[in-house]
């Protein structure tokens, strides 16, 4: 019976992956897809590593207690403690993800370079993750104080925190393993989806084993798995835009399609236009992927799983749109390259 459910889960994973693999303009070699999938299976190790650290050494970093300073302390004091704790969590996840990627690739030099490049750009992602949670908790505190309404900030905050961790770890895996294999934007989407599917695959197996209910594989293959692939695909699209920030900003700025704020924003920050664009897209991808994942998880917690169906349909339509946009960007950039 267990083999039956495992076969169904494997088949669902393959079908979901094949659907989006065939949407690629220039599909990646099967070997690259296989390595990405194995890397996705191992993304649970950084999550387990984080849990091991807070269980045995730093209990204040758990998904519940890490939010306590925002709820119980004065504004600035709570914000300071929370940001410090989040910095520790991000560091733990990055270290475990880096070690996992290095072991998988047998300490390949390319992986070391990918990790080095990611560490250079990690501060904006850390600020984005921390700010999302802080704004959520403070908004709920404000509503509680002004409207005298009791809000389950802990539940919502914990769900968002866990969604952030999962999306961030999956994203790190793509950057550490596949960064230099990305030749166009749709590569980033596909490789992110593959990692997301692998994460969902191993998560479902662990969940089924822990609960002793293998039948849970069926609804998770139809509902939870697409949630993961959509969230990963969203992040992958924006990461793809960030990856090609230099040619994209050059094309858009020259054709006067670029957004007005970059005419002064990059000057204020003393950053190149392409660097500002890159950081913005990474942050945008993280926010959108996390919000999508969080909304879906809240619906599951409230036993409103049926509402996730239209959410999944909308998400799949968005991923299809992202592929079309990535193909347009590919043609635009290659056309400009030929004209040079």
Residue ranges of each PLM-predicted region?
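Hydrophobic alpha-helical segments at protein termini of multi-pass membrane proteins
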Residues: 1-340
